[in-house]
């Protein structure tokens, strides 16, 4: 789960905020001496300082301009529940996370996304250009295995009438989808491994199965679940816009948006130990394609 590390930073940030300025009260006592709140704060600041102060500061800045609703957070949370299935709670637990702490980080990520969207050029010309190569989302099942021999074995079983969903549960090494018969979330161009995506979009009719597809993850067999014909620009504009925005939520564009928000906030760092915390966001060396359409 790519966002779990960021959630840990959220938890640490909250702890640092509570410890700041707390003084000499002991948090741990031993016969050899005590660990004070000040000592803990300084140690955590040294280890996590820059990341923590960045997230705390950006959260404060973004909350003043953008709103993330509980409904939006819950919808994002549900995606992870569905993706990880029965292993979701154990995955959170193994990373010392709770439902609440994970949702807090999802809220922060959504704030960053909204700031990035606000700085995008979503003009008609941009959308029409994007529409030329855009395709509607496609839904497929897949079976992922480590070697071609196993993939051929599955192919034979499919030809003999065995169900794709049953074979996915039995063979697929993709634990996030195997229990659900290999079903993947709908995806569009540029969202998957290029070879996998090309093979998926080449399927024409429901339940068609691809040949063996080699990707960076292993060997796949892909079954088409749903494929929608591409409509006119006027008909598809809302879908095109959503896909375009999603394609522009890159690290580069998010950083550019945060730079702009930080500059507008007139930040003043009081703690000299954290003077370089925002160096990556105040430099002018990097550029981005993200621009405001206003």
UniProtKB/Swiss-Prot annotation:
EC annotation?
5.2.1.8
Q: Which residues form the PpiC domain?
A: 135-226
One cellular component term (GO) for this entry is: plasma membrane
Q: Which EC class heads this enzyme's classification?
A: isomerase
Q: Where is the lipid attached (S-diacylglycerol cysteine)?
A: 22
| BP GO annotations | protein folding
Which cysteines pair up through disulfides? They are none
Q: Name one GO molecular function term.
A: peptidyl-prolyl cis-trans isomerase activity
Give the signal peptide as a residue range, or say none if absent.
Answer: 1-21
The UniProt entry lists the main location of this chain as: membrane
Give start-end ranges for the coiled-coil region(s): none
Task: Answer yes or no on keyword Nucleus.
Answer: no
Q: Which reaction does it catalyse?
A: [protein]-peptidylproline (omega=180) = [protein]-peptidylproline (omega=0)
Q: InterPro entries this protein is in?
A: Foldase_PrsA, PPIase_dom_sf, PPIase_PpiC, PrsA_foldase, Trigger_fact/SurA_dom_sf
Job of this protein = Plays a major role in protein secretion by helping the post-translocational extracellular folding of several secreted proteins.
**Similarity comment text for this entry:** Belongs to the PrsA family.
Q: What is this protein's record name?
A: Foldase protein PrsA 1
What taxonomic classification does the UniProt entry list for its organism?
Bacteria, Bacillati, Bacillota, Bacilli, Bacillales
């Amino acid at each position: 789960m790519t966002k779990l590390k960021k959630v840990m930073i959220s938890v640490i940030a909250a702890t640092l905020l509570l410890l700041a300025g707390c003084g000499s009260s002991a948090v741990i006592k031993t016969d050899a001496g005590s660990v004070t709140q000040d000592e803990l704060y300084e140690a955590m600041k040294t280890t996590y300082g820059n990341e923590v102060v960045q997230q705390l500061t950006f959260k404060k800045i973004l909350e003043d301009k953008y709103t993330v609703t509980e409904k939006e957070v819950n919808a994002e949370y549900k995606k992870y529940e569905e993706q990880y299935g029965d292993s979701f709670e154990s995955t959170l637990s193994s990373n010392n996370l709770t439902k609440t702490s994970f949702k807090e980080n999802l809220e922060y990520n959504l704030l960053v996304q909204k700031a990035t969207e606000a700085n995008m050029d979503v003009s008609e010309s941009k959308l029409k250009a994007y529409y030329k190569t855009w395709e509607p989302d496609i839904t497929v099942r897949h079976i992922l295995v480590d070697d071609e021999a196993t993939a051929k074995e599955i192919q034979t079983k499919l030809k003999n009438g065995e169900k794709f969903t049953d074979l996915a549960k039995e063979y697929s090494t993709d634990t996030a989808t195997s229990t659900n018969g290999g079903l993947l979330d709908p995806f569009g161009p540029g969202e998957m491994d290029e070879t996998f995506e090309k093979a998926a979009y080449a399927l024409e009719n429901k339940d068609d199965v691809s040949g063996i597809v080699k990707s960076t993850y292993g060997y796949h067999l892909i079954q088409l679940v749903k494929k929608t014909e591409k409509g006119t620009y006027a008909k598809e504009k809302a879908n095109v816009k959503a896909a375009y925005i999603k394609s522009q939520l890159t690290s580069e564009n998010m950083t550019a948006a945060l730079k702009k928000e930080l500059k507008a906030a007139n930040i003043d760092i009081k703690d000299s130990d954290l003077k370089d915390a925002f160096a990556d966001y105040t430099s002018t060396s990097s550029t981005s394609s993200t621009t405001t359409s206003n």
